[in-house]
Amino acid sequence: ESPFDTMSEAEFSAMSTSEKAMRIYEHYGEALAVDANGQLLSRYENGVWKVLPPQDFARDVAGLFQRLRAPFSSGKVASVVDTLKLIIPQQEAPSRRLIGFRNGVLDTQNGTFHPHSPSHWMRTLCDVDFTPPVDGETLETHAPAFWRWL
């Protein structure tokens, strides 16, 4: 549930810029992060962090102001977005030992398979499902080029 479903225009307008930024973060299910340079926003969706085009995100934020009929300007929207970038988690580099699949993440170091998690910081996924090897199947005999492919 979004805080914008129950908040009034008066409540929102009375908030500080940082409080507005936090409500926007909550609206996005706390699934936002900023890159190491503090500029690019990403949203966690379906196992990966996807970069949000800045103008599209600004328009979405303006839409939240409009939803409440709260007055805004491009400067106010930019201020809230810039403040949001200071509050949300900073993206980490994905571990080189992890391979993302549609149905989860394979840890190549220990061979374990895990459900997707924002903490994996994956930016891409292979567009196939991972299936565990059948009895007798090995990378050496059934996929000898696998490690070169990586």
Where are these regions (language model features)?
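Intein modules and their embedded homing endonuclease domains
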Residues: 1-140
